[in-house]
Amino acid sequence: MDSDKGESQGKPETPGDESPKRILLDIAPSAWEHPADKAALQALRRIPIFDEVLKKMFGFFGEKPVRLAFQADAVHVSNKQFPEVYRLYKEALRTLDAPHEYPLFMSQTPMVNAGAYGMNKPFIILNSGTRLLLTDEELQYVIAHEIAHIMSDHVLYKTMTVLLINLANMGFPVVGVAARAVLVGLLEWSRKSELSCDRAGLLAMQDPEVVMSAMLKMAGGPTSQDRTNLNEFIVQADAYRESGDVADQVFKVLNVLGRTHPFHVLRVAELRDWVESGDYDRIVSGQYARRGEPDSAYEEDLRAAASAYADEARDLLDSITGAAMQAGSDFLSGFRK
């Protein structure tokens, strides 16, 4: 998305704008990326045959067929189609100072979800159920969350995850045991990546209550003010925070469940930790890493997180490396004619 960069710092919107949100000029994705996200991706790339599987998958499908498969049953959002959603989208792009406007589509499905997909040409799919459940501000948070997946270069791996899950559900012969190692690693990383983009969504909204309210609704379904209580949901999230290592065990259980996203209560707890650390306020005040500039502070945080994550990553790799080596040739042969 083209914009006048002005000074190399965030700045408030002008008096004529609809909100006092600070535009985060030139913000680098590393400003919001959760260190565990990067550590998990590093572990994923160490899985035997991962790179080869990635190449074979996209060589087999190709970008255009994948794009058409996602977009064939969806409506392109614009100033003429879903104009209010488009307005929210444009504002989120502006606040995060996204370098491009990515195609946004609305898909008719009651499932409350959204996703960013693609290879070289990323796009966003927004489910209509999400539009019906959430307020405009809550919906904008979801949209900003997906913009962040694109800006953080998550979409290639996100797309691969969806393809492997769908192939497995269809009984595709190469996805029974052979690709399980790669899929388990992708799911582990996918959940960590959501923590990064939750932060970006908050930066776009600059109102923690909006984000937590959206998560409350996504966790509990349709709601009204006299039936749910956001404060009670926050108390529930705080209980997770106080459980310490139990939260890490939850992530491991999710490997068995095959979830692509962490539980919403856990996400709220992680987000509150980040806000209370002071990092959120520093970014909104204009102190953040910028695109094209080195970020030594983030690199130090990443090293610390990678060290803390090492045992978990090693356990994951140990549990699937043998299967990957044994099944790798079978998986790859499934794509040969």
Predicted regions and their residues:
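Hydrophobic or amphipathic, alpha-helical segments that drive membrane association/targeting
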Residues: 1-120, 281-337
